UniProtKB/Swiss-Prot annotation:
Location in or out of the cell: Nucleus
Disordered, as annotated region: 1-61, 284-367
Protein name: PHD finger protein 10
Alphabetized UniProt keyword annotations: Isopeptide bond, Metal-binding, Neurogenesis, Nucleus, Phosphoprotein, Repeat, Transcription, Transcription regulation, Ubl conjugation, Zinc, Zinc-finger
Superkingdom classification of source: Eukaryota
GO biological process, one term: embryonic brain development
Amino acid sequence: MAAAGPGAALSPRRCDSDPASPGAQSPKDDNEDNSNDGGHPSKRRRMGSGDSSRSCETSSQDLSFSYYPAENLIEYKWPPDETGEYYMLQEQVSEYLGVTSFKRKYPDLERRDLSHKEKLYLRELNVITETQCTLGLTALRSDEVIDLMIKEYPAKHAEYSVILQEKERQRITDHYKEYSQMQQQSTQKVEASKVPEYIKKAAKKAAEFNSNLNRERMEERRAYFDLQTHVIQVPQGKYKVLPTDRTKVSSYPVALIPGQFQEYYKRYSPDELRYLPLNTALYEPPLDPELPALDSDGDSDDGEDGGGDEKRKNKGTSDSSSGNVSEGDSPPDSQEDTFQGRQKSKDKMATPRKDGSKRSVLSKSVPGYKPKVIPNALCGICLKGKESNKKGKAESLIHCSQCDNSGHPSCLDMTMELVSMIKTYPWQCMECKTCIICGQPHHEEEMMFCDVCDRGYHTFCVGLGAIPSGRWICDCCQRAPPTPRKVGRRGKNSKEG
C-alpha cells in the first residue's frame, strides 16, 4: 500500500479503551503506571479521546439518573401550630435546581439547622428517611426559595407551580369526597311537619344576630374615621321636636321701641305683687340687699355692736355690706373692720353678684328636718361616746349628714347656740363641707364658715376678695325673713287714721 500523501485523509483511530482491540499503551501511560508502582503520589491523568468518550457516556447516564422531580420538593410548616412558618430542605432544593454547592452560591439566604423534633416530624410525613435523620439537614425559608426560583430559574418555578396547582386541586377533590361520604352516611331525613318549626328557629336566631349587631354598632362603633377628610365622624344626637303650634311666632313677639305692644310679659308671684304700688300694696318697699347703707365712721360700729342682734331681729337688715360684724373691744379693731366693710362693698358693686334665686333657696332651717341618730357613735377627737367627753362629762354627739363622723360640741369648740342651729339643717363635717352657693368642695383655702350656722361659703361665691378677719355671718343668718308690716291703703279711697 502506498504511503499516504500529506493531503490524504487519516484513518480513524481506534479507542484505546476499547476492550476488543488490544492496543499497546503509550509511553506516557507506562511512565504514570511505573510512578504509581514506585510509591510516588499519583498524578491526574490527562484524558485521551477514548477517556472522553467514556466520560461522555458516564455523564449522560448521571444526568438521566440525577433528575429530581418537582413532586419530591416538599414544603412543610414548623412548628405545625398557628405560629409556624413554611420551610424547604436545602438538600432537596439544591437537587431540584441542579446546584452542587448551594450554600456557597447563595450565602445570603436565611438558613438554620433542623432540630431533632423537626427531623422526627419530617420522618413521620415520609419527607426524609431514617438515614437522613442522622445527618445534618438545613432548612430554608420557602418564600426566599420561591423568589430565587422566579428570578434565576423560571422554568423550574413554572414546573413547581403546576405541581402545586395539582396538589391543591387534589386536596379540594378529597375534601369534597369526604363531604359526600358524610352526606351519604347521614341518612336521616327531615320530616315535612317540622319544617315550619325549623324556619321559625332560623328566623329567631337571625333576629338575635341582627339585634346584637345593631346594638354593637350603636354602643361600640358609633364613630368612624373618614380617610378622605381625616375627620372622626360622630352621629348627630336626636332632638325632641315640638309641635308646630308650640313654635309658631305670634304677630307681636317683641317690642321694637319702648312702649310698643308685645305679647311677652313677666308673671309676678303673689309675694312680689304685695310690694307693687298698685293701690293695694301690703308691704313696705324692701331695702335693696345689693346696695346696703354704708357706715359713716367707726364709732357707729362700736355703738351698734351691743344691740346688733336685737336690731337685726327687728329690722332684718345688715350693718355691713359683707356681713362682717366686728366684736372687738379696742377701737383700732373696729376701725379696721369698718374699712374692710367699705372695701368689700366696693368689690360687690364692681363684681356681679349671684342671682337672687340661689340666695332665696338658703334658709336658716329646713322644715321638718331631724338630725341623724347613731347609737354607738364615738367622738373623732377624744374617741369617747356620749357618756363622757374630754372633760369627763356626759354630752350628746353631733353627726355629719353625709358620713359617719361624729363629735362632741365641746371638742369642736361649738357654742350651744351653734349646736341648736346646726340641728335644724343637714350639717356637714370639715371633711364633707361644701359651698352652699356652688355646691363644690374644692378650693378649701378659700372656704369660710358662718359663725352662726357653720355653713361653708367660697369667698368668690359671695363676692369677697379674701377671707375676712374676725366674726363673719352669712346672708342667710343676718338677713332674717322680714316680718311684713301692713300699711294703710294709698290713694283716693284711703282713710286717714
